[in-house]
Amino acid sequence: EGRCGGAGTGKTVTLQVLAEGFSAAGVPVFMADVKGDLAGIAVAGSADHKLHEAFTKRAATIGLDLQYQAFPVTFWDLFGEQGHPIRATVAEMGPLLLSRLLELTEPQEGVLNVAFRLADEEELPLLDLKDLQALLTFIAEHDSEISARYGLVSSTSVGAIQRRLLVLENQGAAQMFGEPALELADLMRCDAHGR
């Protein structure tokens, strides 16, 4: 659900309070935090905070006992530099999504579909971009027999796909592909204490 409002209207605090409440109840929470504003729930507050007195007063007014506590978090990071890496296998991404990502033409997309079909039928793992590059090289070297089996596979299209993969690798995307692959359950789990 989206939260809209101007600066200082309490959007971040509202999300933090909701996440803390769900976590305390044992309900896993996933939140996108591009700016890092929500990351504060990973560390317990302290009596040294400039607003501690105001917090204590407010808690007493509404009949609560103020207790600072940290909540379990996992910071996910596409490149694995400042958090837990997010990975997917090439096979899990599939030819359609990968074709869109690479901005392939229709004939090139057809060749990529042939590559995925061949990998599936021959039980070849497509875990990372190196696996896909190796498969495309094999297809280019055996284009006549593969064309007879699946339809025309041009070496020009194979070369174009390989160049697009090179661009993707140069942008650091190779780190995203591989194992262990991210599963939905990885995003929605509790810690050892059920929070």
Q: Which positions does each model-derived feature cover?
A:
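Hydrophobic anchor at the beta1->P-loop junction of P-loop NTPases
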Residues: R3
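The conserved Walker
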Residues: G6-A7
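Hydrophobic positions on the alpha1 helix immediately C-terminal to the Walker A/P-loop
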Residues: T14, L18
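P-loop NTPase motor domains
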Residues: A19-P28, G36-K50, A54-R195
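Conserved lysine of the Walker
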Residues: K11
